[in-house]
Amino acid sequence: MTKRKLACVSAASMMTVAAVLTLTTVQQADAQQRKSLRWTTSQVGTYGYSVAAAMAKIAEQALGGEYTVTVQPYANPTVAMKAVMNGEGEIAYTADVGMTQFHDRTGGFKDYKPTKPEIAHSWYAYPMESMMATTVKNATNMKCWKDFSGKPVFFTPAGFMNWLNFQRIFKALNYDFKHVQLDLKANGDALEAGTIVGSVAYTTSGAQLASYWKETEIRMDVRIVNPCEDEIAKLKAAGLAVVDVDPKGAFSKNVGPSMLKGVPILFGYNARADMPEAVTYKLIKTFYDKRNELVKIDSGFSAMAKDFVGMQVQGINANPQVPVHPGLAKFLKEHKAWNDKWKISASAS
């Protein structure tokens, strides 16, 4: 090769290297300039984690690329909530029952003292309906929820919101809550082996099952056991709702009753009070504007899409003693849905 050709090749190579280095430097600088927004959720395989993972890209776009959104799974929502208030995240996966326990410092929050500002009402996304499932064989002897009292049951992992929901359900019914802790993937095995006689199943907006329950349903036939009429009356007297769930909406097989009965809880992703008002507002407004598109991503958003504003009001009213994030307060005032009895949390500018 001639010296001239060598010089040309060398120059071209140097230009390529320079271009790559420049691009890398720009990307690194961009990454360094972007702020971090961490969503803490329940463990991988749960509905809460799946939704947050799907929403991360939408959240980044809503914030104009200013933030890098990451999803951080934890053992359960209780731990995820604490992680945010200990500075390990900015937005926590939670539910109305979890917000109640946190405010009252009961259950997993007994004697808990956050090192960072507390979480505030920010965005409620979907209802879940807790119900009880068993095997086809066991269903012959399990006719009401009282038949699970004192028996080994997987009430979803300890600290999960559905676990907390069934704690208050059994308390209202004066039943013995005998929980067996399992890995999510062991749900079907434990039912088949008889290690547990029941397992709490849950639907989202009556239309979605958690990933581990989809796997369970594929490998075996299950039956949903509805609460009996006297149990429904006691639950309602205790202030708990009991709703109808069409089994065809979430289950792919026959699960017994033509209409299922579940006790709902409202799930959301609540931000720490010191998250800037503008950031929270942008997220909420984007989710509102894209509510019909979100249903296409996941049918669990159907209830939110039908009444986005009403769902936020419902979430606040479940725990009106908990302050509302300024970003949500601004949104609700724009939609004439603000209640002056609610409190607004202090926030960063």
Language model: regions and residue ranges:
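Bacterial N-terminal signal peptides that target proteins for export
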Residues: 1-15
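C-terminal segment of classical bacterial N-terminal signal peptides
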Residues: 17-28
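Bilobed "Venus flytrap"/periplasmic-binding protein-like clamshell domains
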Residues: 36-63, 67-70, 129-195, 203-207, ...
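Extracytoplasmic small-molecule ligand-binding "clamshell" domains
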Residues: 50-86, 255-257, 347
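Pocket-lining segment of extracytoplasmic ligand-binding domains
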Residues: 96-98, 105-114, 120-121, 137-138, ...
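Ligand-binding clefts/hinges and TM-proximal coupling segments of bilobed small-molecule sensing domains
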Residues: 149-168, 239-309
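An extracytoplasmic/periplasmic, membrane-proximal ligand-sensing/linker region
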Residues: 186, 203-224, 234-236, 278-349
